[in-house]
């Protein structure tokens, strides 16, 4: 739980000033939030992918070498295809984490409740919108926030179903 605040603090202290200095705009932008999310999801994707690659029997790699393939061809055409479903799982977990992330993004994204015109504008994510406004929302406003949550749920459901179909296709 505290990792999110650490990532958010890192974004505020390092990324926001960096964007300010490079682009000459307020550092709380969609670009800053995107870079921070990329930094946040990389450990998840790398960890799961590494486990999947290590789970591939070494005989795949060694057999490819024995047939005359180079190291690179053995890795890219024998080992990685065998680990594909695990790598896809890591990517899906990373995307799910990025979609559900609220607090670190709120800290660096500018929290502006309007449509951004570009990467250097502030933005408010759907999850942040729910968190910020649910406390005082009534009637139609509350229903709109619940609809936002349903949209997020459906989006994650579509990602998971797509992943399941890819895994099923991979096993066939």
Task: Please place each PLM-identified region on the residue numbering.
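Hydrophobic transmembrane alpha-helices
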Residues: 35-45, 95-99, 109-112, 151-155
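Interhelical loop and adjacent transmembrane-helix boundary motif
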Residues: 19-22, 105-153
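Alpha-helical transmembrane segments of polytopic integral membrane proteins
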Residues: 8-15, 42-46, 105, 158-159
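Small-residue-rich transmembrane alpha-helical segments that form helix-helix packing/gating elements
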Residues: 3-18, 148, 152-155
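Transmembrane alpha-helices
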Residues: 3-6, 45-49, 53-56, 71-107
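Loop-to-helix entry region at the N-terminal start of transmembrane alpha-helices
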Residues: 17-44
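C-terminal transmembrane helix and the adjacent membrane-cytosol boundary/short C-terminal tail
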Residues: 50-54, 58, 65, 92, ...
């Amino acid at each position: 739980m505290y990792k999110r605040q650490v990532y958010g603090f890192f974004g505020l202290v390092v990324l926001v000033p960096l964007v300010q200095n490079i682009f000459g705009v307020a550092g709380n932008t969609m670009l800053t939030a995107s870079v921070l999310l990329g930094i946040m999801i990389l450990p998840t994707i790398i960890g799961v992918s590494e486990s999947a690659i290590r789970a591939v029997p070494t005989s795949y790699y060694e057999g490819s070498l024995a047939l005359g393939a180079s190291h690179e061809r053995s890795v890219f055409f024998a080992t990685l295809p065998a680990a594909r479903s695990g790598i896809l799982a890591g990517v899906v977990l990373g995307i799910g984490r990025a979609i559900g992330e609220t607090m670190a993004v709120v800290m660096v994204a500018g929290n502006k409740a309007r449509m951004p015109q570009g990467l250097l504008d502030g933005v408010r994510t759907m999850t942040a919108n729910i968190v910020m406004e649910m406390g005082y929302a009534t009637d139609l406003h509350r229903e709109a926030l619940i609809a936002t949550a349903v949209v997020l749920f459906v989006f994650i459901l579509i990602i998971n179903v797509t992943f399941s179909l890819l895994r099923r296709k991979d096993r066939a």
